[in-house]
Amino acid sequence: MDDLTAQALKDFTARYCDAWHEEHKSWPLSEELYGVPSPCIISTTEDAVYWQPQPFTGEQNVNAVERAFDIVIQPTIHTFYTTQFAGDMHAQFGDIKLTLLQTWSEDDFRRVQENLIGHLVTQKRLKLPPTLFIATLEEELEVISVCNLSGEVCKETLGTRKRAHLASNLAEFLNQLKPLL
């Protein structure tokens, strides 16, 4: 496990939860995750769940993605998706507003790996360098990804070679995130 990435993710999650506590006097609330089982759920309302991060309990790797392509995935991606269970978190990096994707449960982790495989299949078909997404943006065709060749974090337009460098590594990126509520 990449300790710098794990700590940066835990630190951002703490900043996010602290900001939520300060503004709402509660743990983060999600309507999107209502009805989806998770160890993160601390209480449920009529149409939403309150959640708090929990330690990841599964196998701490994305080996299914590696096996599907017979490639080695950046260690930071293994760490990013297997440090904790948590709800997705809204954040800002510079002037970019994003939703940082998280693993909600072991079932969700399997789905995330399937989506990463699908993403890599498309990139391979289009002969694009491999990236692995970590966040979504308001613009549906743009994501924040980690380049599997260099480990750098970029803003990417799906299906194209258009990429903008954001950070040299995932820990640096996570350390610069500001929570958005």
Swiss-Prot record:
Compartment(s): Cell inner membrane
Membrane-topology descriptor: Peripheral membrane protein
Keywords: Cell inner membrane, Cell membrane, Membrane
InterPro entries: Syd, Syd_sf
Statement: the UniProt record of this protein carries the keyword Membrane: yes
Pfam family, one: Syd
Gene Ontology cellular component terms for the protein in this record: cytoplasmic side of plasma membrane
NCBIfam families (UniProt xref): PRK04968.1 (NF003439)
Record family assignment: Belongs to the Syd family.
Biological function: Interacts with the SecY protein in vivo. May bind preferentially to an uncomplexed state of SecY, thus functioning either as a chelating agent for excess SecY in the cell or as a regulatory factor that negatively controls the translocase function.
Protein name, UniProt field: Protein Syd
Gene coding for it: syd
